[in-house]
């Protein structure tokens, strides 16, 4: 736990120096190496929160619900033991973390690792059990394999499945959403969910390129993040975002509007 706090503190200092004033912390390192909970089940999350307090950065803490290793509720593997919660333990964790929070600087949210890591009933119950004002984050459609596996399991693509089976709105942030078709882009735009793009990580992992220009054309919303902290630079993330669209479309000046031409 102390190492996690030290690492988070270092990263938050780097972020503040780079101009970031707020971080949404996608936190799923919950347990000991053997998968057992710490004496205080919220130990790791509290260390990450304390790092935000110590550095002064604003934080939205997003404890991640991670229960399965694949679509359809497949059993987790040994390498995932530190991440795993059942739904009851997850709700208790969220309730504990919600106590004595400094609402001026810190927020909290609901977070699902991915559609392959949770079930429909878990998503629905978590959403009804926790405050409706909290933001909701999920990694979705990041890689082609995820899309293919989702289609094989359900007959639907990930964003399509989420829209049809659960639904999402402006409180949701769909992280990556790299591999979406035209209908899914339109669905996201209409919902006013935010697409959370992480250009440096997506480039580092070779994930692909999200169709930003299509989303903007339909009035959709997007934000940038760093995800794996490959780099901590707003300018670099935005440069990669724009250059990715140029490479995809073989045109210049892609991510702009008449109000912000450059």
Kindly label every feature range from the protein language model.
Residues 11, 15, 26, 194, ...:
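C-terminal helical cap
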Residues 19, 23, 52, 110, ...:
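Divalent metal-coordination and catalytic microenvironments
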Residues 164-171, 213-262:
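His/Asp/Glu-enriched, well-ordered alpha-helical/loop segment
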Residues 128-135, 167-170, 187-196, 217-222, ...:
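Glycine-enriched alpha-helix->loop->beta-strand junction motifs that scaffold or abut catalytic
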Residues 1-36, 43:
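Metal-associated gating/positioning segment near the N- to mid-region
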Residues 31-175:
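Metal-coordinating catalytic core of metallo-dependent amide/deamination hydrolases
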Residues 142-193, 203-215, 228-235:
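Catalytic core of soluble alpha/beta enzymes
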């Amino acid at each position: 736990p102390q190492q996690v706090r030290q690492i988070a503190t270092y990263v938050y200092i780097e972020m503040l120096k780079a101009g970031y004033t707020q971080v949404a912390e996608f936190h799923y390192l919950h347990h000991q190496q053997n998968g057992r909970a710490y004496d205080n089940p919220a130990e790791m999350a509290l260390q990450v929160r304390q790092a935000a307090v110590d550095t002064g950065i604003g934080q939205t803490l997003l404890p991640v619900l991670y229960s399965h290793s694949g679509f359809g509720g497949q059993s987790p593997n040994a390498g995932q033991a530190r991440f795993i919660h059942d739904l009851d333990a997850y709700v208790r964790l969220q309730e504990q973390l919600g106590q004595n929070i400094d609402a001026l600087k810190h927020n909290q949210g609901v977070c699902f690792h991915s559609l392959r890591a949770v079930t429909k009933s878990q998503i629905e119950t978590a959403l009804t059990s926790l405050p409706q004002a909290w933001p909701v984050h999920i990694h979705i459609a990041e890689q082609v394999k995820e899309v293919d596996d989702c289609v094989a399991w359900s007959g639907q693509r990930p964003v399509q499945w989420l829209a049809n089976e659960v639904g999402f709105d402006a409180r949701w942030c769909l992280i990556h959403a790299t591999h979406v078709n035209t209908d899914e882009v339109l669905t996201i735009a209409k919902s006013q969910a935010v697409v959370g793009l992480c250009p440096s990580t997506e480039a580092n992992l070779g994930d692909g390129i999200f169709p930003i220009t299509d989303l903007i054309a339909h009035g959709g919303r997007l934000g940038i993040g760093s995800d794996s902290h490959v780099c901590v630079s707003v300018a670099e993330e935005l440069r990669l975002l724009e250059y990715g669209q140029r490479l995809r479309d073989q045109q210049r000046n892609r991510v702009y509007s008449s109000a912000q031409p450059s």
